[in-house]
Amino acid sequence: MAGLLKKIFESGKKDVKYLERKADEIIALADETAALSDEALREKTVEFKERVQKGETLDDLLVEAFAVAREGAKRALGLYPFKVQLMGGIVLHEGNIAEMKTGEGKTLTATLPVYLNALSGEGVHVVTVNEYLAHRDAEEMGVLYNFLGLSVGLNLNALSSTEKREAYACDITYSTNNELGFDYLRDNMVVYKEEMVQRPLAFAVIDEVDSILVDEARTPLIISGEAEKSTILYVRANTFVRTLTEEEDYTVDIKTKSVQLTEDGMTKGENYFDVENLFDLENTVILHHIAQALKANYTMSLDVDYVVQDDEVLIVDQFTGRIMKGRRFSEGLHQALEAKEGVTIQNESKTMATITFQNYFRMYKKLAGMTGTAKTEEEEFRDIYNMRVIEIPTNKVIIRDDRPDLIFTTIEAKFNAVVEDIADRHAKGQPVLVGTVAIETSELISSKLKRKGIKHDVLNAKQHEREADIIKNAGERGAVTIATNMAGRGTDIKLGEGTIDAGGLAVIGTERHESRRIDNQLRGRSGRQGDPGVTQFYLSMEDELMRRFGSDNMKSMMERFGMAEDAIQSKMVSRAVESAQRRVEGNNFDSRKQVLQYDDVLRQQREVIYKQRYEVINAENSLREIIEQMIQRTVNFIVSSNASSHEPEEAWNLQGIIDYVDANLLPEGTITLEDLQNRTSEDIQNLILDKIKAAYDEKETLLPPEEFNEFEKVVLLRVVDTKWVDHIDAMDHLRDGIHLRAYGQIDPLREYQSEGFEMFEAMVSSIDEDVARYIMKAEIRQNLEREQVAKGEAINPAEGKPEAKRQPVRKDQHIGRNDPCPCGSGKKYKNCHGKEA
């Protein structure tokens, strides 16, 4: 252990030596840079950009660029970065975490690597925890960047897409972590590439990096859509399919558990739902509900595939026969079963897109962060983000007095002592900051101070604007400020007049947080830039952390010695508290790591889908090649399921292939039984694909190329988006129920990975099948609008247009059942005058 500590200590010393050497090189250019005029200094930015274009790396430019940014800060802001700030800037440029104590000027430090990395033209994101800080830093530091000829954008929640696009197009963009994540998700839901706002993710500097990458790591960002407004369509589809007759209206393929409507079944469906063509894009929802109702009624059996318990449909594992609690069938099949069994149909709000901060920030080419407290989480930063934590020495020696903890037996005794201490210090004119773990604690102390008539401010992490003002004044003479631990981060407490003589800022902690890092943040509020200060934590044996880690013995010992109201100050207790904190931190790290392992499954799937969407949206020419691959995979699956080359021909189900092709890919009768007989499985596939190719060629002639391309995009985007949202929903249910599988020797994570993969494979096949069906069967209308995909609107001519004048129908005309009726109604012949014929 001693050897390990020595190694860590020595590597830290090595880091500091290297950083000091590099910082000295920058300082050596100070006179030369100071001699440049404002114009010449600005010209340096243009020169650097050209050098990057010609192949010089940012590392090559570091010393010169930092010297220019440093001189620029002096002229534009009146601030001249210290040597330690140059060192911090180098750490950030190298994609690591600079641990710099409160008051050491992290905001100014960040300007150096931000300036350097902005020269690449790829865009730099500066990330803060709230909009107030983003706004403040963009405004204050923007003066420097503009002075040096760089553009600065501020990305806020209230901005329109156009304004966001402009903000992201700037050299440097300030934003909150939430807004960045949501913009990424929204970009992957757009239907035109022009609607995307972000550029590829290049470099981000995260302020208060521990807060964003550790404390908020487990919080997923979720964009939810409304669930289907009504469950009535499931009930209607269920009622309809129960009126159908097997063979006449639908066919069942036992092997693949698929059900197809026949031509008669389709006609009945069109009449029942009062639509012209079930395969029109506007009717995808109806067709989907019918398909699921058919599957639920004619391929799924009660007490075999599922059971009904307590008004719920529960899935039965086909291999073990166990009930799989928490799992739901995807794509609406579960709701179709609920309609079939007459139980309550559950419709939750749908998750349309989701990502965690862990996975969002790991997509950047380079990531850096700064904070006053990261050393305690060093292992996590290294394992998960591949970032090292490097401690930067302070500019001036810290002279703050950190006192050992005071421990009381009861909470009441502790709070009384806290209030007495505040009153004494307040009387001397010493500013006091009281840190609490919970809001109710801050309110309790506030009421005790009111009774004593001590004027004070209470700060909860609710109002960012007001928060900064209160914190700014917290260092004034006699000020008393009560704050929950995280409140006011990012704003310095500067000491007012006459407070140094009173002892500087006194920080009083009312209990230990379960994380040492949060305690250290509170301590670090005092003693900034070599100022005097004092910190004191008050604990009681009834505090949650003490209760969790066995303080009963000590409590009874203190009571035995008659110390119920007195405090003890013991290094042993402080060490016990710290080891308890270490245990909690370890548990929390394990839990965040586990979240990441689960989320990685969805991350890999998300990347595949988002990449496919991006290719579709950006495609300039026809998507036929992609679509033909989907059709080929679908035909391959259907043929191999019904006519496998590994089975004797007498076991083949050629009629099943014809039923599927008639229902989904080609006009009825295009392929007959005679066409398929005496052929190999491969020949059958090729025959079907040749016929489909000819039908596709014919379809392409119906519209100009750019309009047909738009039709292909509409189909692909609608199918991919619908299936992906259903899949996320199914993965959510799988994740919720997977821990229930931890029976026997089953590892829930392994199960989640393998089942998640199977579900993804099934979704991809389902996308192939639906795209093939809609491309081949949908009637192409003119003026297709991709926007209608996003809104799920009808892809029909606008309603409300005057009805076309109907033409008389002559009996001697030969008209196909699916041809448009010549009367001009716009309906199919079979649904109009064909009925009379």
Swiss-Prot record:
Chain sites annotated for binding ATP: 85, 103-107, 492
Enzyme class: translocase
EC number: 7.4.2.8
Gene3D superfamilies named in the record: Helical scaffold and wing domains of SecA, P-loop containing nucleotide triphosphate hydrolases, SecA, preprotein cross-linking domain
Cofactor: Zn(2+)
A Pfam family recorded for this sequence: P-loop_SecA
Region (Disordered): 791-837
Gene Ontology cellular-component annotations: cell envelope Sec protein transport complex; cytosol; plasma membrane
Membrane topology of the entry: Peripheral membrane protein
Cellular localization per UniProt: Cell membrane; Cytoplasm
Coiled coil location: none
GO biological process: intracellular protein transmembrane transport; protein import; protein targeting; protein transport by the Sec complex
UniProt keyword Isomerase present: no
A GO MF term: ATP binding
Biased composition (Basic residues): 827-837
Residues annotated to bind Zn(2+): 821, 823, 832-833
SUPFAM superfamilies registered for this protein in UniProt: Helical scaffold and wing domains of SecA, P-loop containing nucleoside triphosphate hydrolases, Pre-protein crosslinking domain of SecA
Subunit structure: Monomer and homodimer. Part of the essential Sec protein translocation apparatus which comprises SecA, SecYEG and auxiliary proteins SecDF. Other proteins may also be involved.
NCBIfam families named among the record's database cross-references: PRK09200.1, PRK12904.1, secA
Family label: Belongs to the SecA family.
Name of the protein in question: Protein translocase subunit SecA 1
Native species: Listeria innocua serovar 6a (strain ATCC BAA-680 / CLIP 11262)
Gene field: secA1
